[in-house]
């Protein structure tokens, strides 16, 4: 069983913000498998899917971004999923919009959702898919940028990368993180 976690913030006011692109990837995966999200045994929404004979839980924490670790640990414990079987999908403002980067492990890199997951797990060795939301952000408050909505032009780019992110996550499910990294990482990320 694999666990694919998309990070974001709950509440309608956060829909379609840069910070919620992880949620959008999970929604795309649920759409691809024609399933809806249900409330889990913890503070998360999830769906169970099967891809090429492999069981997958796709999950959206219903905590705020900086408390995402609680939902991840609850799902891991409930479904008995080891850390090696997890992929976390999150936004990254240091990667250009339209680019993605997969890693087998690493630091939080300033992403508070990842930071809390690392804190709760006590380790950094879980796979992550970072979705670029733009290097060309204005100087000043990063929080207002990541919590802001995409411009019309940016939205088109974001919408075009979401299916690729879902495909990369499914590649991880079938072939593992190394294969997904080799297939989907781009030089400009």
From Swiss-Prot:
It comes from the Bacteria. One of its GO terms (molecular function) is peptidyl-tRNA hydrolase activity. Monomer. Belongs to the PTH family. The active site is at 19 (proton acceptor). One of its GO terms (biological process) is rescue of stalled ribosome. The keyword RNA-binding applies. Its main location: cytoplasm. The lineage of its organism: Bacteria, Pseudomonadati, Chlorobiota, Chlorobiia, Chlorobiales. It is an enzyme of class 3 (hydrolase). One of its GO terms (cellular component) is cytoplasm. Hydrolyzes ribosome-free peptidyl-tRNAs (with 1 or more amino acids incorporated), which drop off the ribosome during protein synthesis, or as a result of ribosome stalling. Catalyzes the release of premature peptidyl moieties from peptidyl-tRNA molecules trapped in stalled 50S ribosomal subunits, and thus maintains levels of free tRNAs and 50S ribosomes. Keywords: Cytoplasm, Hydrolase, RNA-binding, tRNA-binding. TRNA binds at residues 14, 64, 66, 112. The record marks 9 as: Discriminates between blocked and unblocked aminoacyl-tRNA. It is found in: Cytoplasm. Its EC number is 3.1.1.29. The record marks 91 as: Stabilizes the basic form of H active site to accept a proton. This is Peptidyl-tRNA hydrolase. It catalyses: an N-acyl-L-alpha-aminoacyl-tRNA + H2O = an N-acyl-L-amino acid + a tRNA + H(+).
